[in-house]
Amino acid sequence: MTRESGPGLPVEPETSPGFQGSRAPMRAGRPRPVREYAGLGSVAESNAWFKQLVASGSTSLPVAFDLPSRMGHDSDSPIASGSVGRAGVAIDSIDDMRVLFGGIPLAEVSTSLQIHARGGAPFLLLCQLVGEEQGVAAGRLAGTVQSDVLTEYVLKEYVEPEAYAFPPEPSMRLIADVFRYCEAEMPKWGTAAAGLDADEFAPRLSFLFASRTTVTDLAIEVRQAERLCKLRAVRDFLRVNDALVQLKRAAEGTDNVLYPMKEALAAYATVGEVWDVLREVWGTPSRAV
């Protein structure tokens, strides 16, 4: 059924079984797209795999992040030990994102950040910054970010209780900031919001089928820690500090935190440093959440 067909009318050529979309002709006569959930180990290894996917015709890159990245901890943090580069790629700074998407035409592929919106905000901004370095305006970048934070609080208590970063209220605020930011700066970036009409969001629904791989590689953790050490040695400390102060002020007030967050990441603040500022202001969730 398409919106144009009207209620009670048959849909052609998208008749059951085998619907290929909500609007005729959608993908009739074209191969069904395949988007592989990818990202494992070091950024260089993930980049090599992304290049293979693009060379084979993939137009979308769903990026898997490791647990420390999803939690907002840098790879050299003690809490990250043993988890760096496992079940996803480790991203700590803009340098990592440059390597991850090096040689990837971001104007021609979409990027799906397999991380909740409250955790995906810095990675969304890092994608924007790297895209702009490639000469791709933010308005041309396409991708998606998840936003099912309430489901996360219900399920992660039993599945992955350490994976959420903030209590529910500031988490919802951060998601709302992501929505507003994307609407203003990155209109082709897909977000999901409550209260939308089904006709508006249903045509943009997608599903992901994934398999599980487990890899233990201490060398990845060591290499990532070395990258962070070099980054902190050469960056402008005062610029980073000033940007993080502005982020803290925004978090304490009502301004959209994504704008100062972008400035901090552009100044080579790490994802963990950004998250530490927000944790200082917003706190962390209790086990009672």
Show the residue positions of the predicted features.
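Catalytic alpha/beta active-site cores
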Residues: 1-208, 287
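Generic surface-pattern signal
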Residues: 55, 180, 233, 249-252, ...
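Generic structural signal for hydrophobic core residues of well-folded globular domains
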Residues: 104, 182, 251, 264, ...
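Residue-level signal for alpha-helical context at structural boundaries
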Residues: 115-118, 145, 261, 265, ...
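Catalytic-core signal marking the mid-to-C-terminal active-site face
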Residues: 206-265, 270-271, 277
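Long, highly charged low-complexity segments enriched in Glu/Asp and Lys/Arg with interspersed Ser/Thr
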Residues: 275-289
